[in-house]
Amino acid sequence: METVSLITILLAATVSNADKICIGYQSTNSTETVDTLTENNVPVTHAKELLHTEHNGMLCATSLGQPLILDTCTIEGLIYGNPSCDPLLEEREWSYIVERPSAVNGLCYPGNVENLEELRSLFSSARSYQRIQIFPDTIWNVSYDGTSNTCSGSFYRNMRWLTRKNGNYPIQDAQYTNNQGKNILFMWGINHPPTNDTQRNLYTRTDTTTSVATEEINRIFKPLIGPRPLVNGLMGRINYHWSVLKPGQTLRIKSDGNLIAPWYGYILSGESHRRILRTDLKRGSCTVQCQTEKGGLNTTLPFQNVSKYAFGNCSKYIGIKSLKLAVGLRNVPSRSSRGLFGAIAGFIEGGWSGLVAGWYGFQHSNDQGVGMAADRESTQKAIDKITSKVNNIVDKMNKQYEIIDHEFSEVETRLNMINNKIDDQIQDIWAYNAELLVLLENQKTLDEHDANVNNLYNKVKRALGSNAVEDGKGCFELYHKCDDQCMETIRNGTYNRRKYQEESKLERQKIEGVKLESEGTYRILTIYSTVASSLVIAMGFAAFLFWAMSNGSCRCNICI
């Protein structure tokens, strides 16, 4: 038995002294994890976060220019010309409009704006405005300087309040033709006094009629006289109206009372981001590609979770916390006490922490020592595929869907609820599609890396042929001596198998001879052991029979 053990040790020593080359992959101390279709929190050497999560908390310029910040005014205050908004009346240009939640200068005379939400949307979608006079004061033969204490003792800068003059209010008939070549936004109002006395004092009669007509509209208005709850100390109201006069169209107004007449209109030009932000954020000295009500952001990532109301050149919004794409290998820690190379045990056992110049590579052992080198070709191909994957995800998700914070009046609450629900569901679909796409790509990436290692292994296996033997752990034990230059030819694909065939053949025969000798010795020892054991058993049985017959315990009768 000692002879068998000795031969086994010699055989193992003969094999382990062979020059050796292993194929493996990179392992790092990374803590990155990704999810795949079948696994969660899979450790990887490298991962790319696809979701942008930060903003600067400021109002910034965008590619379309600076925002228009209304400060104490509302949009309707600007449009109708609240005297407190005079600084805003000069020609302006903007990329988006900012309305402060605390703004108090809206409609100074109480009343309602017809289709206010549509008006705000129309005005904010333009990029600039220019005020233009529609009706000069001289066109009216009544008083046109009606004022109100609620409007700072004055009145709207874009409308004239027409009242009786010298106790009379003749029919007013005015026309204006748009020769500007652009659309003109014009505004007017109808006054509804609280009492008949107030009505007569202002317009001499109670049964007045006002008509406003263009090629597209024909509106008739009559006053609704009666007291209403006090607002700003007033029981009267003004109903505010607006329309758009297209190039070449004519506006005609006829009235015998209660008319708040157009004075100035707006030529709206260009196109902005069509957004109104209601926020207290401060203006910053910054330019961003994407703006939200929370702040600006610049990113090249395909997704963001800052705000679903982002506008500009923005990544698609998905409401999750993280979305990571695997851009490296499955991170399998190396075994620290296994194999000839210590921590390096082949791709079956784990990754190589010392492989830093590539994702896949080789380690060898020969008379010159131990060496490691990356396989740049397979690594570059894998990196190119990863880059293509990232671009592919961006391309697949680049269909823009902007959610606008729609404004609906109180009577349209159900519309608002339906709109928000639809927006939320669309966002859920985008998020699901994005997550599913990344999970699929992660699964494919990790599977491809496994295939890349196997491909590299099989490439070396084909090159070595019968000049080496596999050890089952991702390594090849060579039948011939292979110095560093020889190892390099294996790595770069120029290995000359014929050059080493004769040496390999002799070494293989030598190893096989040791195996045959050990097998013959094992057979001899087995036969010897079997015969010896049989003799011992036979002698023991004979001694037992002799003892039994001598004391009479056993008797043998022979019958003839």
Task: Indicate where each model-derived feature is located.
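Extracellular/luminal domains of secretory-pathway glycoproteins
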Residues: 2-560
